């Protein structure tokens, strides 16, 4: 698991706790935000395990019912397929839950908290410029109309590109990973498109700034 990927998720969860137009957080407030984000991940792990347990019990009950009560072969097959799908969902949830403790453990590493805090501060300190830049590359839309978590995913990626020197493709890929966890398919495509237009705009600006030969 990449420490910086975890740091980005902590930063996203931390930003979601800040008011829309908050002042940059103090060191103490930043530590509290990161701690709250860590607790959110731990709670998510517990929720995944509880949901997986419930789905396994439900699939077990359905399997027992199919064994005892099916009147014909077709009904048995349909019920068995339903049981298989329930079991697969439970397995997937369990896999996600087993990944999360590693994330929670890594959040205690200094490099993770340091980079996560740095991301939060860059977004907070440069909010106006970041929002203005993102609005410039949106087509017939404005950032304030986008769901809050999607806004913050875009801001984090823009902050990395504009202020931290993260390669544009890396920042875009990491933003899409966050969108896979915290947005829907439409949001993921939107985030990817906005950031690619940002990359194109920055590339054109860089080429225009080069001295002519």
From Swiss-Prot:
<dbReference type="GO" id="GO:0003723">
    <property type="term" value="F:RNA binding"/>
</dbReference>
<dbReference type="GO" id="GO:0006353">
    <property type="term" value="P:DNA-templated transcription termination"/>
</dbReference>
<dbReference type="Pfam" id="PF01029">
    <property type="entry name" value="NusB"/>
</dbReference>
<dbReference type="GO" id="GO:0031564">
    <property type="term" value="P:transcription antitermination"/>
</dbReference>
<protein>
    <recommendedName>
        <fullName>Transcription antitermination protein NusB</fullName>
    </recommendedName>
</protein>
<dbReference type="InterPro" id="IPR011605">
    <property type="entry name" value="NusB_fam"/>
</dbReference>
<keyword id="KW-0694">RNA-binding</keyword>
<dbReference type="GO" id="GO:0005829">
    <property type="term" value="C:cytosol"/>
</dbReference>
<keyword id="KW-0805">Transcription regulation</keyword>
<comment type="function">
    <text>Involved in transcription antitermination. Required for transcription of ribosomal RNA (rRNA) genes. Binds specifically to the boxA antiterminator sequence of the ribosomal RNA (rrn) operons.</text>
</comment>
<keyword id="KW-0804">Transcription</keyword>
<dbReference type="InterPro" id="IPR035926">
    <property type="entry name" value="NusB-like_sf"/>
</dbReference>
<comment type="similarity">
    <text>Belongs to the NusB family.</text>
</comment>
<dbReference type="InterPro" id="IPR006027">
    <property type="entry name" value="NusB_RsmB_TIM44"/>
</dbReference>
<keyword id="KW-0889">Transcription antitermination</keyword>
């Amino acid at each position: 698991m990449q420490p910086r990927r975890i740091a980005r998720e902590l930063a996203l969860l931390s930003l979601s706790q800040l008011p829309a137009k908050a002042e940059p957080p103090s060191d103490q407030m930043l530590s509290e935000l990161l701690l709250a984000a860590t607790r959110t991940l731990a709670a998510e792990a517990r929720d995944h395990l509880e949901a997986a347990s419930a789905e396994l019990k439900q699939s077990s009950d359905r399997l027992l019912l199919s064994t005892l009560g099916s009147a014909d072969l077709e009904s048995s097959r349909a019920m068995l397929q339903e049981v298989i799908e329930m079991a697969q969902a439970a397995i997937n949830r369990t896999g996600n839950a087993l990944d999360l403790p590693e994330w929670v453990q890594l959040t205690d590493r200094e490099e993770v908290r340091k980079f996560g805090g740095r991301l939060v501060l860059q977004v907070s300190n440069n909010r106006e410029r970041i929002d203005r830049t993102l609005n410039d590359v949106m087509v017939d839309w404005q950032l304030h109309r986008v769901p809050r978590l999607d806004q913050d995913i875009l801001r984090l990626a823009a902050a990395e590109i504009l202020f931290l020197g993260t390669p544009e493709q890396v920042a875009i890929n990491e933003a899409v990973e966050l969108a896979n966890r915290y947005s829907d398919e439409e949001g993921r495509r939107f985030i990817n498109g906005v950031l690619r237009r940002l990359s194109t705009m920055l590339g054109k600006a860089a080429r225009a700034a080069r001295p002519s030969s």
